[in-house]
Amino acid sequence: MYADESMIKIKHEVLYEVAKLAWAGELEAKRDNIAVELIPGPQAKFRCCIYKEREIIRQRVRLAEGKSAGPVDDGNVIQVISSACEDCPISSYTVTENCQNCLGKACINACKFGAIEPGRTRSHIDSTKCKECGKCAQACPYNAIAHLQRPCKASCPVDAISYNEYGITVIDEEKCIRCGKCIHSCPFGAIGSKTFIVSVIEAIKAGKHVYAMAAPATEGQFGADITMASWKKAMKELGFEDFYDVGLGGDMTAAYEAQEWAEAYKEGKKKVTSCCPAFVNMVRKHYPELADCVSTTVSPMCAVSRLIKARDPEACLLYTSDAADDLTRVD
C-alpha cells in the first residue's frame, strides 16, 4: 500500500497535466511536452535513464486519454505499461540460505521430476525441469525453499496474467475480470487503467449536459474535510450539470434485489448479486454454470444512470469510482 502511494502520485501528475492542456485546448499541440516537463533530467529519478522514464510517462498519457498504453488495443480498461514492466527475474521455487545441505535430502526425494540437485553448500532447483508442484517446499524440514511469484501474477484471482517471450506481463482478456488487483500489486506501477478525463472535458466545453456520479467509497479518497456536499459544489463549478451519490442507486437496487431473491427462495433457486462488475465477470467467464443465478437487477450505477436519463434525455453520464471494475464510460 505504501508503494502504491508513489504510483498514485505519478498518475495524478499525469492526469493533472493532461486535464490542464485539454481545458486550454492545447493537448494536441503540447502532448509530447508532458514527458519532458515531468521528467526534466538530466538525472533519472526511478529508472535507469530519463528516456525510459519519459516513455513511461508517454504511455501513461495515452491511458489518461482513454487509449491503450501501447499500439494495440484489446478493449480492456486494464492495461500493461510495457515500458514500466521490469521483467522481474523471479524463479517460482527457490532454495534460500536457510538450506542446511542436510543428509536426508528430503527435497530431492520429494521431487518427481529430477529438478533438484545437491550443491556444495545448498540444493539447487533447475527451473527448466521444475513443474512448480511445491512438493519440495512441503518436504523441507527447514522451510528453506521459498515460493516466489511476480506480485502481479500472485495477486490475480483468476490466473489471467502471463508473460511474453521478453518477460513482459501480458493480461489475458478472456480470463481478466477487471478487478484491478494487479494495478495495486505491481511495485513498478507497470499496470494501469484507462480514464476518460479528456472526453469529459470536451463534452463540458461543448456545452453538453454532463452529469457526474460517484460511488460512496470515493468520498474517503480526498480526506476527512471533503464531503459529498463539497464535492458536488466543486463539480458544478467545473461545469457539470449536477452530481449524484450512487449510494442512492444502492438503496434502489437493494429493494428490487431483495424482492427477486425472495421469489427465488420460494422456488428453491439460488441467487448471487449483480452489484459488483468484477464478480459478475468472474461468474460469466469462470463459472458459466452459475450465470443463471446472477440477479437480473441492474447495478446501483445503472439505476442512477436510468434515473438521470429519465429526467434529462440529453444527459451525458460520467461515473467515478475507486474500483477498477467500475471504470466504464456511460454514454
Model-based region annotation:
Residues 128, 142-143, 148-308:
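Iron-sulfur-cluster electron-transfer modules
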Residues 99, 214, 321:
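Short beta-strand/turn micro-motifs composed of small residues
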Residues 319-326:
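Conserved small/polar residues in nucleotide/adenosyl-binding loops
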Residues 1-139, 143-153, 159:
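Ferredoxin-type iron-sulfur electron-transfer modules and their immediate structural context
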Residues 94, 213, 319:
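Conserved beta-strand segments that form the floor/walls of ligand-binding pockets within enzyme
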Residues 327-331:
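N-terminal low-complexity segments that are often proline-rich with Ser/Thr-Pro
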Residues 314-315:
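An alpha-beta-alpha
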